Regions:
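Conserved N-proximal alpha/beta basic substrate-recognition cap immediately N-terminal to
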Residues: 1-65, 71-72
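Short arginine-rich
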Residues: 64, 97-98, 296-298, 326-344
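Internal nucleotide-binding/catalytic subdomain
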Residues: 76-212
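Flexible, glycine/charged-enriched surface loops at secondary-structure junctions
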Residues: 101-105, 175-186, 230-241, 331-345
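Short, well-ordered beta-strand elements within core beta-sheets of diverse protein domains
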Residues: 151-155, 306-314
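Active-site "cap" helix and flanking loop/linker of ATP-utilizing ligase/carboxylase catalytic domains
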Residues: 163-183, 191, 201-284
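Short, well-ordered alpha-helical segments
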Residues: 310-332
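A cross-kingdom feature marking charged/low-complexity
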Residues: 340-367
Length: 367
């Protein structure tokens, strides 16, 4: 529907239909990388589980990662240990009819996962490039179900080796489709320093966009409109941001009625808090206990299982992580079993030296 407004000349800063296809049709997105001269990991698209099982059985020496195509449930993404658990999961999804859309199997590549993105307009990419590291599992230590993104560490930089290899070569293609807005490429970087793109995100990711606000300066409307008109006026803070997702049961599933996780007060949270380093999601205005014990005191309450993201900023990854968790402990008082990973950022202590030996993010420090 937005495309008709674009054609009428309305200033719309965001993904168009062709850009969305890059993300949602993984096989098509992989072909775009290849056309830009960027090597990709082999993948195959399936509609039938039996066909996917046959591929795995014919290649028992390989590990595979399964991913839904389009808007499929992220919980159906699975990284196998060997052929046996991949076949088991495919049979399980087939039996339960968990997903009736298309999905892909992609060969597993070992390495460090890192993403790079940028804001794109008529004048090309902003000079401020965003490097980021996602934490995708529900529980600390990367255990539990995949949620898409449970927390993220990021920083803006004007010199990114990863961007030079997998993002900037796409500039001509983006101009060709009339793209505007944010675009992100998630990669596996192997021990030789080769980046292997996994997927496009042709929109501000969630909660990535919320965490970005901790680094942005000024009114976003101004620099977004300027980007549409070919000017780069985005201003950002130096330093690193860390964001942590705060959820409640039955996240990441949707097996309970909305009313069962709605209406729980978030005590003492002010609107001032919610416009700085606390980024609200599924909440609304409601009531908590007043002095007389009745629920008559206006306050912010939950309105779903994905409640908020808390961000922090610092000169190092550790500083940003501590800032985010300190804010969570001081400002967030929830009562319905809040779920928060307590290790967002920590894996970078081991990952950064591996990346830096191959020339990536050399000026990023863990401590």
């Amino acid at each position: 529907k937005l495309e008709s407004y674009r054609r009428k000349g309305y200033p719309i800063y965001g993904c168009n239909v062709e850009g969305a296809r890059w993300e949602q049709d993984r096989e098509y997105g992989s072909a775009i990388f290849e056309r830009a001269g960027i090597a990709t990991i082999p993948m195959q698209k399936f509609k039938k589980y039996d066909d996917a099982i046959a591929l795995v059985l014919a290649n028992k020496n390989k590990r595979y990662v399964s991913k839904p195509v389009g808007d499929g449930d992220k919980a159906l993404s699975y990284c196998s240990k060997d052929w046996r658990d991949m076949v088991f999961m495919l049979n399980k999804w087939k039996k339960s009819n968990a997903y009736d859309g298309e999905f892909v199997l992609q060969e597993f590549h070992k390495g460090c996962e890192m993403a790079v993105g940028g804001w794109f307009g008529l004048g090309g990419f902003s000079k401020h490039i965003l490097e980021n590291w996602e934490f995708k599992k529900l529980m600390s230590g990367d255990h539990g179900p995949a949620t898409g993104e449970q927390g993220t560490v990021m920083r803006y930089t004007q010199k990114s080796l990863l961007a030079e290899k997998v993002l900037l070569p796409l500039e001509g293609f983006l101009h060709g489709i009339g793209y505007s807005g944010y675009i992100d490429v998630n990669c596996i970087i192997d021990d030789k320093g080769n980046p292997w793109p996994l997927e496009f995100t042709t929109r501000p990711g969630w909660p990535l966009f919320q965490i970005q606000q901790a680094l942005h300066l000024g009114c976003p409307v101004g620099w977004m409109l300027d980007s549409l008109n070919g000017k780069d006026t985005l201003k950002v803070k130096d330093g690193i941001a860390c964001g942590i997702v705060v959820s409640q049961p039955d996240y990441p599933y949707n097996n309970v009625k909305k009313k069962e996780n709605t209406g729980y007060p978030i005590f003492d949270l002010t609107m001032e808090d919610a416009t700085s380093n606390i980024h609200l999601s599924e909440v609304k205005m409601g009531f908590g206990p007043g002095k007389d014990g009745r629920n008559t005191e206006p306050c912010i309450v939950t309105a779903g299982s994905y409640v908020m993201t808390v961000s922090g900023v610092g000169k190092t990854v550790h500083d940003a992580k501590c800032d985010a968790y300190d804010t969570y402990k001081k400002k967030v008082c929830m009562i319905n079993s809040p779920m928060v990973r307590d290790d967002i950022g920590e894996k970078l202590e081991e990952m950064l030296p591996l990346l830096q030996k191959n020339g990536y993010c050399k000026d990023v420090k863990y401590k």
